[in-house]
């Protein structure tokens, strides 16, 4: 028998010099089954092994990856050792097979329980409400073809349908990828030709618009400085044209550029007097432009303009009042000017006085 001795250490000596008591030894007897079992607890108190060995029990430790495992339909655990019932051929785990005298599935009385290990091999039919077990593969295949042929046909049709669907989807995906990756050359050529024609048409339209624009009129000239060539749609009276329309810059330019138009619509443009002669808005007084003596040649020469030539008389006719070049002097409304306007139909006024507007 194994004996264990426990000894208590003596305390330290005190100052009075008392002797310690003798050590006490306690003997503990250990049963024989603990010694035979060679347990780590019997070898020492409180010692722990550095590694714990875990050994999985049953089929799981020896089966390969991807291999199927049968589950017991009664306890819903993986089966390590089968208990095959005879005569119904239903298979359970060994514990569930021994737990009752009748079958759990068909309630048939159990005559014998056949023990089959995991590695020996067993075939169980997975058809609904069947679950019969077979020890040989030929017997299992014969049972399936004889009793469950309809299930095999349905499974084959489903597999064919799935394969056809997969193939159709693959073809559609490949067709879509081909159209996305490489379009037809004819389509590319047509698109390029359309783009070129559109760009060419735009360029032609732009050139035609530029060519169809009328020439811009010269707006740099101030009002009043126009060419002496008459417009085709306007008739000028038989008056002599002025020789030079250039004026000194000190003189204001008349804003009314349109010459007098001929009488239209059959009625006179001027009111008539008792004597039958027409009277203008300003009593027919005719004005002439300032000559070079009044403007002075020094002013025009200093500003860079050539001295203008003598201007001829301009007779303003029309329904609009003529502008006055001398805003400080207003035309007098006298009967003498009226008579002068009627008498002076010629051009020149040789006996006039410029300061008095024709008064003698």
From Swiss-Prot:
Residues 293-304 have a biased composition (Low complexity). GO terms for biological process: protein ubiquitination. Residues 1-11 have a biased composition (Basic and acidic residues). GO terms for cellular component: nuclear speck; RNA N6-methyladenosine methyltransferase complex. Keywords: Metal-binding, Nucleus, Transferase, Ubl conjugation pathway, Zinc, Zinc-finger. GO terms for molecular function: ubiquitin protein ligase activity; zinc ion binding. It comes from the Eukaryota. Probable E3 ubiquitin-protein ligase which is a subunit of the N6-methyltransferase complex, a multiprotein complex that mediates N6-methyladenosine (m6A) methylation at the 5'-[AG]GAC-3' consensus sites of some mRNAs. Associates with MTA, MTB, FIP37 and VIR to form the m6A writer complex which is essential for adenosine methylation at specific mRNA sequences. N6-methyladenosine (m6A) plays a role in mRNA stability, processing, translation efficiency and editing. This is E3 ubiquitin-protein ligase HAKAI homolog. It comes from Arabidopsis thaliana (Mouse-ear cress). The gene is HAKAI.
